Every structure is written in C-alpha cells, then in structure tokens.
C-alpha cells in the first residue's frame, strides 16, 4: 500500500515510517521540515494547512491511504490549535475526495476526553461512546478534527479511524503511564490495523498497549484487528513514586487537566 504519512519527521512518524515499511508498505513522507537522514522514499516539505500544496502532493503521488500524524503536539491558543489539527485534516480530506482516496488514519489524542474522571476501579473502562470532554484547546481541536472526519465518512463514504493516542514512549516513566502507555511496537500494530481493517466507516479506538491498569477499553481497537502485545506493568517496579501522581490520576488527561494549562482562548497584543 502507498501510504501518505504526514508528520513523518516527528517522534511517532519516524517509528511508524520504519514499522510500516518493514511490513511492506511504501511510505510517502510529508512534513514541514526537510527530509530526515535515512528516509527512503518520496518526501514533500509541505504545510498540511495549505490546501493547494496538499493537493499537489496527491496529484504527484497517487497514495492509496493517508496516515495523518502532523500537528503541534502541545497546547496553544484556540486559533493555533484549530489550524494545526482541524484545518490540516480538512485539507487532506478535500484532497482525498478529489483524488478518490478512501482511507485515513488520524492521530487523535486521549486529551479529546481528558477531563473525564479516572474510572473508579479496573473493572470499569472508558469506551468509544463516552462524550467528548477535552482538557485543553489542544483537546478541543482533536474533538473538532474527529467531527470533521465523521462528517466526511458520512458525506463521502470515506473510511476514517481516529486513534486516541495515550502516552507514546519507549517505556512508561510515571504512574499515569502505567495506564496510558502506548509502546512503539504497538503503535505500529495499531496504525496497520486501522489501515487494513475491512470497511470501518468512521471509527474511534484508544491508542494504548494492553496495560493491566488501563483506563480505556481496548475492544473498539480489537474490532478493527488491533491486538496490542505490550503491557506497561512490565516496567512498574522501575517507575518512581512522585508527589504529582495522585493529581495526575484524577482525570484521564493527567496534567493537561490542571490549572497550569488554563489560558485565554485568544492571544492579545
């Protein structure tokens, strides 16, 4: 499969590029920066928020599917966040419709539901039917991008999978990560499952590993063929206790739900 991968120079993008290539997919890299050393394949230094530039990439490369990982990975003003996550998604979707590309896999975030209280115990997990409860403008933009994906799936019959990524790290570093961790290998498994699942329409899954202490339900991903193999519990003994642990576990978005991230929606001179 020829996969257009946005944000290909980012931390997730580099891992997914190698993982999908190892599984036989051809990666077309797209990012605002120059081609990273060692990348093999076509590369386009393009801003996904520029619809004409995005359309030109589709015209040149004829991808079979899109993996959209691009976007500012932290908090900003509301306009900055909407541009980074919603307008980029819309530009890609318009190009997909124009060039008859059927499938997109989107890197959404746990922060789309980050103000959701932590489940009371391990027998209760948060499903894909929970209402949006963003914890930041970053989370708001992920909710809005998911809504645009849902619209295009309904309007044009696209297949769109939103992966609400937890904590993508080589290994868990805090107590919260024991619930939210997504290993590098499981991330690749998740993306490939979302790319190859039979006609999912619009779907949401939680991008986490098979963590013993997980807060989110893995069943939505399993319905699409995502079978995580790693468990943060393997590292539990090496994770130090911290004074912030109790606060970070109050809501599933962790520190993003705290007052540290409260700010006006709009920047003023």
Q: Which stretches of residues belong to each language-model region?
A:
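Alpha-helical substrate-binding/gating segment
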Residues: 165-171, 181-202, 210
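Glycine-rich NAD(P)-binding loop of the Rossmann-fold in SDR/ketoreductase-type enzymes
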Residues: 49, 65, 80-91, 99, ...
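Conserved Rossmann-fold NAD(P)-dependent oxidoreductase catalytic core, especially the SDR/UDP-sugar
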Residues: 91-132
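Conserved beta-loop-beta element that borders a ligand/cofactor-binding pocket
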Residues: 109, 146-170
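Catalytic helix-loop patch of NAD(P)-dependent Rossmann-fold dehydrogenases
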Residues: 83, 119-157
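NAD(P)H-binding glycine-rich loop region in Rossmannoid oxidoreductase-like domains
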Residues: 46-85
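Conserved catalytic-site region of short-chain dehydrogenase/reductase
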Residues: 75, 107-123, 137, 143, ...
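N-terminal Rossmann NAD(P)H-binding glycine-rich loop of SDR-like oxidoreductase domains
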Residues: 3-23
